[in-house]
């Protein structure tokens, strides 16, 4: 008999689940960008997250303390000392003078009114590691000669771990000093103190402290965790923060870049008093993408950037070294163009919380100006429009209007479910609600597809924000890990028929997939699922029958078959049986006894029963598994 090229694998599942088939001969491409992520400068993702910067409010943004004159996160030292916050500022902005923001550009002034008195400022709550070398920088100017003492101490100041002194001469110019300190002890609640005893007025423009071991100002351990989850696309700098971001400020030295105030500061920057301190610029973001193997996706500040400024950003990234902004890039050590292909024209325009036009027609009119200017610099861009999708009005009056040049339309959605874990009944109900809430993504994506198709234009869906709502304000759990697994299975399974090649999780760093403390970081249950499922990347997606619950995904790379399985049941095991001629090369189980917050998956070998033509396994409740099968055996 002629060999049948289309080999079928039967998967038989218990508990009434119908038999499934995996068709190895009928495969289709799997977009690598289904494994996309966001990196937005919000909440704890940068400050206290990816950034290696240890000092809070190091550029003294915002208002001073009541009757004290000291910037937030700092304390004054000395009894008869006069503290003021304001001009003259060392930090600055290059452009966007029309942006309505306040209190971004300050310096901290310390007037010591009594000669011989110790005056200065301190910050508490730092984590010091014995023997670790730290790089510190000060930007100051003074009215009289000053000996500035920088001390690393315990919280009270009684125990001193390291000291460095600087001799500062009076000048109207800013003095920039960099030095290194290595503490003689470890401390979870250390302080850094900047003091002097001379009667003088010392103005501090910026301060900095970070471990000397860093990756472009980022924590290497966090970068390693990000690499572990396998992002193939990273969207930056937002999200909502795209409406605050001044890309040209990134051309300034990092200490000189003005803080950036958020329009919706309580939501986006609640832990940093409404400000971002611009620790990561375009060059460092591109370096991060290259380190972790991701394509960059940039979002322009459509509300406050002019079309020309958006085009200049494109030229900075993609222009030849002899172009105006390509020359600037080359002067910063990056001769070759970055080749940034993906560009979002604003974020969530039309929802009301973003500044700029909030109507479909007004957005389309302004977006067209940015698009035309950007394409003059690079015709090969893939552009993304935004709006309150799915929305038929916006589809017709915005997405369709821009469709000749903008082929992708952004879709954002956050699932929500009650979370109560204090008794067995509420724990089970919450688990079921969380793990089933991924179906809202199915409904939204299908509605979006119908809405875009109704315009008659060929438009792709970019589902570039998704997660559980407010996941960034609470600890993760195995329940959310199963939710992420089911969501990823849906996105992989339906990416082609919904024409949805781009999907970006929001967001991994300190807000879902990577848990970060001053001492270290680790993957959450969500991150563990991503690390497991990245095995599907670069494979071809196999067609699977009777897979309505998205329990199974299979991809093929030549003679290797990768299968991931999900048992989303709260309290029932699930059996999978494969009629398959092959050898199991790898079988891993991610399981846990707990599903409540603070729970993680444990990794163990998956028990597999193999005969000549059959492979079977049983997954315990709320678990995920990976099998790799050698089809050439």
Role assignments for model-derived ranges:
Residues 20-278, 295, 311, 361, ...:
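Extracellular and organelle-lumenal recognition/adhesion modules and their flexible linkers in secreted
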Residues 41-42, 460-552:
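Aromatic/acidic polysaccharide-binding cleft in carbohydrate-active enzymes
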Residues 190-194, 359-481:
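Noncatalytic carbohydrate-binding groove/subsite architecture in carbohydrate-active enzymes
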Residues 208-216, 263-278, 298-304, 346-364, ...:
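The substrate-binding groove and active-site-proximal loops of carbohydrate-active enzymes
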Residues 211-231, 285, 306-342, 367-376, ...:
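An active-site-proximal structural segment forming one wall of the substrate-binding cleft
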Residues 324-358, 413-415, 459-467:
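Active-site groove signature of glycoside hydrolases
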Residues 548-582, 591, 622-628:
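Carbohydrate-binding surface patches
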Residues 606-633:
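C-terminal beta-strand-rich structural cap/linker in extracellular carbohydrate-active enzymes
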């Amino acid at each position: 008999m002629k060999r049948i090229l289309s080999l079928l694998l039967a998967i038989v599942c218990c508990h009434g689940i119908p038999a499934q088939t995996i068709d190895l001969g009928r495969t289709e491409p799997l977009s690598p960008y289904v494994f996309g992520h966001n990196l937005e400068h919000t909440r704890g993702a940068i400050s206290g997250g990816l950034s290696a910067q240890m000092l809070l409010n190091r550029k003294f943004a915002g208002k001073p303390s009541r009757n004290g004159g000291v910037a937030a996160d700092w304390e004054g030292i000395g009894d008869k000392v006069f503290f003021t916050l304001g001009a003259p500022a060392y930090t600055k902005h290059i452009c966007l003078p029309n942006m309505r923001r306040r209190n971004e550009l300050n310096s901290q002034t310390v007037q010591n009114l009594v000669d011989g008195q110790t005056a200065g400022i301190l910050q508490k709550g730092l984590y010091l590691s014995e023997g670790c070398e730290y790089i510190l920088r000060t930007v100051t100017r003074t009215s009289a000669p000053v000996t500035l003492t920088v001390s690393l101490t315990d919280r009270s100041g009684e125990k001193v771990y390291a000291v460095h002194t600087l001799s500062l001469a009076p000048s109207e110019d800013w003095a920039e000093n960099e030095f290194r300190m290595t503490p003689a002890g470890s401390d979870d609640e250390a302080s850094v103190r900047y003091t002097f005893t001379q009667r003088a007025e010392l103005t501090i423009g910026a301060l900095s402290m970070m471990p000397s071991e860093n990756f472009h100002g980022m924590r290497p351990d966090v970068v390693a965790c990000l690499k572990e989850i396998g992002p193939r696309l990273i969207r930056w700098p937002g999200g909502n923060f795209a409406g605050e971001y001044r890309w040209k400020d990134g051309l300034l030295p990092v200490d000189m870049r003005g803080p950036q105030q958020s329009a919706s500061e309580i939501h986006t920057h609640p832990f940093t008093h409404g400000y971002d301190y611009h620790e990561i610029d375009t060059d460092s973001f591109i370096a991060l993408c290259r380190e972790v193997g991701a394509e960059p996706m940039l979002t322009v500040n459509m509300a406050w950037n002019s079309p020309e400024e958006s085009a200049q950003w494109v030229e900075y990234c993609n222009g030849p070294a002899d172009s105006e902004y390509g020359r600037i890039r080359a002067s910063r050590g990056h001769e070759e163009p970055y080749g940034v292909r993906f560009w979002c024209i604003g974020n969530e325009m039309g929802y009301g919380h973003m500044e700029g036009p909030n109507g479909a027609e007004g957005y389309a009119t302004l977006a067209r100006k940015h698009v035309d200017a950007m394409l003059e610099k690079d015709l090969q861009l893939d552009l993304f429009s935004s709006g309150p999708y799915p929305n038929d009005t916006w589809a017709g009056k915005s997405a369709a209007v821009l469709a000749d040049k903008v082929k992708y339309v952004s879709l954002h959605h956050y699932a929500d479910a009650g979370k109560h874990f204090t008794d067995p009944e509420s724990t089970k109900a919450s688990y079921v609600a969380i793990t089933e809430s991924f179906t809202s993504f199915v409904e939204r994506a299908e509605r979006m597809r119908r809405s875009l198709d109704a315009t008659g234009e060929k438009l792709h869906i970019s589902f570039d924000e998704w997660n559980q709502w407010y996941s960034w304000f609470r600890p993760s759990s195995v329940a959310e890990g199963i939710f992420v697994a089911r969501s990823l299975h849906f996105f992989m399974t339906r990416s082609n028929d919904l024409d949805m090649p781009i999907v970006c999780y929001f967001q991994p760093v300190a807000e879902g997939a990577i848990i970060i403390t001053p001492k270290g970081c680790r993957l959450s249950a969500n991150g563990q699922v991503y690390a497991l499922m990245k095995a599907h990347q670069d494979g071809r997606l196999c067609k699977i029958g009777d897979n309505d619950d998205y329990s199974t995904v299979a991809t093929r790379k030549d003679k290797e078959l990768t299968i991931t399985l999900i048992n989303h049941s709260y309290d029932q095991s699930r059996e999978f049986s494969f009629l398959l001629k092959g050898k199991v090369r790898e079988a891993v189980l991610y399981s846990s006894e707990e599903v409540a917050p603070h729970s993680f998956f444990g990794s163990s070998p998956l028990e597999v029963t193999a005969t000549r033509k059959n492979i079977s396994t049983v997954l315990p409740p709320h678990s995920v598994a990976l099998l790799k099968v050698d089809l050439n055996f």
